[in-house]
């Protein structure tokens, strides 16, 4: 996958949600799928609030990083 986040300069690639240089983060990746953008992420068992449900902070991070990546990519498309 050629993710938008792979093209972020090193000085801004440490985000906990999508930074490729943050080894402790989620490393969310977003890519084009036709005219839409897609992020696929499977929460780990330790990222749940109760069994079977992702915690709200993870969901917020997914939305934040996907939206930021999409906006940046759309600007250069």
What are these regions (language model features)?
Residues 1-46:
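Non-catalytic linker/capping segments at the edges of enzyme domains
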Residues 66-77:
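Hydrophobic beta-strand-centered segment that forms part of the acyl-chain substrate-binding groove
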